[in-house]
Amino acid sequence: ERAPADGEKRFEIYVREKAILNLQHERAYSALNLAVTPEEQAPAATENEATDAKKKKPAKDKRKGSADEVALARQWMCQNFFDVRTFGAVMTTFVKSALNCGQVRGPVQLGFARSIDPIVPQEVTITRVAITTEKDAENKNTEIGRKYIIPYALYRVDGYVSANLARKVTGFSEDDLQYLWKAIINMFEYDHSAARGNMAVRELNVFKHDSELGNAPAYKLFDTIHVQKKDGVIAPRNYTDYDITVDESKIPEHVTCTRMI
């Protein structure tokens, strides 16, 4: 495997489906030629004793490097994994013989999405004309299933990007930020699902400050974005049933708002 050049970034993903995190930690130590020897343990005399020893093994008694080695491993993980340098990660899995790559506080933090108006999930009954087994086919011709959908909902989520943490901790760059915007805008285009229907990102408003620590509190900027139902709309069933506005008169100096969508 080719090692990245100084300053070169890679766009691997640390947390993936079925990924084994400790193997990624080992990659960091191997790439940096950091040899760490696990603590020696006395062999158990019997299988039962081995099981008991495993149960009594304290979580803190794990394979780990020195503080300098952990710092180097953490830097390697940030350089190679886009999600680590973006969102951060806890890379101390507290597993026997696991390598410690430290903890990273990511500069990008996203809150939980909430619907603008109350929603009610709808249960849909599905009839399957195929039968699972030959025995079932003797007694029935169809099988019934259920799926839950939401007829329509508009969600809002607030997020934060810390330029200070990006510079000091993970090396998250302006190029990385542009990739993040593209990912957010297109995240449902490559992951369509019958259960989610025509889900899409409708608005992406970005507030940019001209100083590293910001020129205004985030909540004041979020309060300038107003979402409300249009007159006469009782139960929204479409995006056009809402009015979405940004009160630019309340945005302070040295802060700009860009509508990405």
Predicted regions and their residues:
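RNA-binding basic/glycine-rich loop and surface signature characteristic of RAMP-family CRISPR effectors
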Residues: 1-261
